[in-house]
C-alpha cells in the first residue's frame, strides 16, 4: 500500500491542480514516513533504544515542519504576516498608491458638453463672516469720525488753551474739567446729565472760569443754549422762592427742548449756589435724576459755590510740606462730605476743587489786569500792589487769603494817577 502511494502519478509542474498548502502537507507526510522507516531500521540493529529513537524522531519532525513552513512560498501575497516591510517595499507601495489615486481623479465628461473642471462650492458662512467683520470695522471707523466731529464742533482744544492762559494757579482743576467735558461732549447720546461742581475759597478763579465757559459755548453752540444764573441777582429774596422755582424750571425745560431739536447740548451755569434756597436746590436735583427722557440726559450743569472752601484751605495748609496735588482722592472725599451736609444733589456731581493761589499767581493776576487796563507793567509796581494783600505763610510759601478778588479794585485805584 505504501508503495502504491509512493508510485502515485504526480501532476506536472505546469498545471497546479492542488493548492500550495496541500502540496506542502503531502510532502511532509512523505518525509515522515521515510524517516520512520530509516529510524526503525537503525533501532533494529541495536544501535539506539526505542525511547531515544522516538524522541529524536519527534524533534526531527518539528524541525522539518518549521523549516518547510519557512521555505514555502505563496504565489500571491494574500495572507497577513508580521514581517516588517523594507524601505524599498514602502517606496514601491507609495508609488502604486499615488498612481492609483491619479487614475481615480480622471473626470469623465459627457460627449455633448464643454470639458471643464467642476467649480468648487464656496462656504456661505465664510462670506457672511467676512461681511459681518467689514460692517463692524466700518461702524467703528464711523464712530471714531463722529467723535472727532463732535469735539471739533465744540472746539474743546481752543477752550483748554483759553483756560490755561487766563486762569492762574489752577492747572489740576482745568485738567480735570477738560477731561470731563471731552468725555461727555464726544457724543450726543448719554445715560445721565453731566453735573460739574466748582468748589473752593473765594477769589481762586471759580466764577472767572464759569464766565470763560459761558463765553466759549455761546460762540460755538448759540446764545440760546447757554444760561448763566446768579442766585443773589436772579433770586435775592427767599420769599420769592416759589416764583424762582417756576422760572428756573421753565427756562431749563424750554432750552432743553430747543436744543434737542437742533441736536445740541445746552449748558447751565449756576453761580453763588451757597446762597440758593433749599427749595430751589430741590428743583435742580429733580433734573439730575437718571429716570428722565433722553433730551434731559444730554445737558451740562455747572454749580459754582464756596461750599467746602474752608476744608480745601485747611487741607492745603496742612499738606504744604507734601505735594498735595498728588492727593486728589483724599481732597475729593473731604469736599464731598462737606457738600453732602448742604444738600444731597452733590451725590451725582463731579467735584472740581479749586485750591489756594500762591503769591506768584497773584503777581500774574496783577500783570494781566494792568495790561487789560492799559497800564505799563512795571515789576516794582506789581510787587508793591501784591504786597498790600494778606497771605497765609507756611514755610517758604505764601498763599493769598482772598485770592485775586481784590486785584481789580487795587488796579482801579491807580487810574486817577495816570
From Swiss-Prot:
SUPFAM superfamilies: P-loop containing nucleoside triphosphate hydrolases (SSF52540). It is a single-pass membrane protein. GO terms for cellular component: endoplasmic reticulum lumen; membrane; nuclear envelope. GO terms for molecular function: ATP binding; ATP hydrolysis activity. It is found in: Membrane. ATP binds at residues 200-207. The chain crosses the membrane at residues 128-144. Signal peptide: none annotated. It comes from the Eukaryota. Disulfide bonds: none annotated. Keywords: ATP-binding, Membrane, Nucleotide-binding, Transmembrane, Transmembrane helix. Pfam families: TOR1A_C, Torsin. PANTHER family: TORSIN, TORSIN-4A. Belongs to the ClpA/ClpB family. Torsin subfamily. This is Torsin-4A-B.
Amino acid at each position: 500500500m505504501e508503495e502504491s502511494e509512493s508510485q502515485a502519478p504526480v501532476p506536472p509542474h505546469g498545471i497546479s491542480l492542488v493548492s500550495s498548502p496541500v502540496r506542502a502537507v503531502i510532502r511532509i507526510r512523505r518525509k515522515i514516513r521515510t524517516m520512520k522507516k530509516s529510524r526503525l531500521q537503525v533501532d533494529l540493529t541495536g544501535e539506539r533504544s526505542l525511547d531515544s529513537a522516538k524522541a529524536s524522531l519527534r524533534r526531527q519532525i518539528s524541525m522539518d515542519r518549521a523549516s518547510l513552513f519557512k521555505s514555502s512560498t505563496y504565489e500571491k501575497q494574500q495572507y497577513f504576516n508580521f514581517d516588517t516591510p523594507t524601505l524599498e517595499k514602502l517606496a514601491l507601495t507609495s508609488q502604486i498608491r499615488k498612481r492609483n489615486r491619479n487614475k481615480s481623479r480622471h473626470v469623465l465628461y459627457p460627449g455633448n458638453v464643454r470639458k471643464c473642471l467642476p467649480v468648487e462650492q464656496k462656504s456661505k458662512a465664510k462670506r457672511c463672516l467676512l461681511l459681518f467683520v467689514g460692517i463692524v470695522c466700518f461702524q467703528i471707523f464711523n464712530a471714531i469720525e463722529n467723535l472727532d466731529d463732535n469735539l471739533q464742533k465744540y472746539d474743546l482744544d481752543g477752550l483748554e488753551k483759553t483756560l490755561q492762559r487766563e486762569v492762574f494757579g489752577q492747572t489740576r482743576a482745568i485738567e480735570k474739567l477738560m477731561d470731563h467735558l471731552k468725555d461727555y461732549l464726544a457724543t450726543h447720546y448719554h445715560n445721565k446729565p453731566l453735573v460739574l461742581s466748582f468748589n473752593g475759597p473765594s477769589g481762586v478763579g471759580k466764577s472767572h472760569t464759569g464766565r470763560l465757559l459761558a463765553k466759549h459755548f455761546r460762540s460755538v453752540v448759540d446764545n440760546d443754549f447757554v444760561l448763566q444764573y446768579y442766585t443773589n441777582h436772579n433770586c435775592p429774596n427767599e420769599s420769592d422762592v416759589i416764583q424762582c422755582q417756576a422760572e428756573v424750571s421753565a427756562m431749563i425745560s424750554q432750552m432743553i427742548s430747543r436744543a434737542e431739536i437742533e441736536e445740541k447740548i445746552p449748558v447751565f451755569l449756576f453761580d453763588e449756589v451757597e446762597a440758593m434756597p433749599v427749595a430751589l436746590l430741590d428743583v435742580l436735583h429733580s433734573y439730575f435724576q437718571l429716570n428722565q427722557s433722553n433730551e434731559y440726559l444730554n445737558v451740562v450743569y455747572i454749580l459754582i459755590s464756596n461750599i467746602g472752601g474752608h476744608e480745601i484751605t485747611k487741607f492745603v495748609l496742612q499738606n504744604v510740606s507734601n505735594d498735595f496735588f498728588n492727593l486728589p482722592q483724599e481732597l475729593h472725599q473731604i469736599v464731598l462730605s462737606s457738600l453732602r451736609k448742604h444738600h444731597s444733589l452733590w451725590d451725582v456731581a463731579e467735584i472740581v476743587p479749586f485750591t489756594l493761589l500762591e503769591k506768584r499767581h497773584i503777581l500774574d493776576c496783577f500783570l494781566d489786569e494792568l495790561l487789560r487796563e492799559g497800564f505799563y507793567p512795571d515789576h516794582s509796581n506789581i510787587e508793591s500792589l501784591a504786597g498790600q494783600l494778606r497771605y497765609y505763610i507756611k514755610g517758604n510759601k505764601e498763599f493769598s487769603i482772598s485770592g485775586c478778588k481784590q486785584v481789580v479794585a487795587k488796579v482801579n485805584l491807580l487810574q486817577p494817577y495816570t
